[in-house]
């Protein structure tokens, strides 16, 4: 049975995770940022980040830190929103994205978090640019796989 170290800069998110996974005793919870992890080097077999890399202040620094804390032979996996190559799907997605803040305001009374979400997705780098950054920051055998027509992608790389 392995251990899971969950890191998030948002205390409320960690509290939600603790509630959801209260029956698991192999998870530790840490407030922190991907750019400055408080773990020793060469510690982890896997490093995963989901829908968080685009929210970091410095993507390269975050990738360097991920590489640092991975053991040699460790694998980096990143699930993130990406760029859609199919023009028809992209057209539909862009128009759907315009209504997300309105729906958010209707459901939760706030549109700002959803406006931020759409802007952060729009300004995030594309799949090939992320592969390039992963390579520049020490990862090898980097690749990605589009899911849901490219709305999201899983990026993978190894510390050799």
Label the model's feature ranges.
Residues 1-37:
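Class I SAM-dependent methyltransferase SAM/SAH-binding core
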Residues 4, 76-77, 141:
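A short hydrophobic/small-residue beta-strand
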Residues 8-9, 58, 81:
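Short beta->alpha hinge that forms the Motif I/post-I loop of the SAM-binding pocket
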Residues 35-47:
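A short acidic, Gly/Pro-enriched loop at the edge of an enzyme's catalytic core
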Residues 45-59:
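A short SAM/SAH-binding and catalytic strip from SAM-dependent methyltransferases
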Residues 60-75:
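A short glycine-rich, Lys/Arg-flanked "PGG" loop and its adjoining helix->strand segment in the class I
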Residues 83-133, 137, 143:
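C-terminal alpha-helical "lid/dimerization" subdomain adjacent to the S-adenosyl-L-methionine
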Residues 131, 135-160:
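Core SAM-dependent methyltransferase catalytic element
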């Amino acid at each position: 049975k392995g251990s899971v170290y969950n890191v998030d800069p948002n205390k409320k998110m960690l509290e939600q995770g603790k509630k959801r996974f209260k029956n698991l005793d192999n998870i530790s919870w840490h407030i922190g940022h991907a750019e400055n992890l408080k773990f020793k080097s060469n510690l982890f077999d896997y490093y995963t980040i989901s829908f968080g890399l685009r929210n970091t202040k410095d993507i390269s620094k975050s990738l360097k830190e991920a590489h640092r804390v991975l053991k040699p032979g460790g694998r980096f996996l990143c699930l993130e929103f990406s760029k859609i190559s199919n023009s028809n799907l992209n057209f539909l997605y862009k128009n759907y994205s315009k209504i997300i803040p309105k729906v958010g305001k209707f459901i939760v009374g706030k549109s700002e978090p959803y406006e931020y979400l759409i802007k952060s997705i729009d300004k995030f780098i594309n799949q090939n640019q992320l592969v390039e950054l992963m390579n520049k920051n020490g990862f090898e055998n980097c690749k990605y796989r589009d899911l849901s027509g490219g709305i999201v992608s899983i990026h993978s790389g190894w510390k050799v």
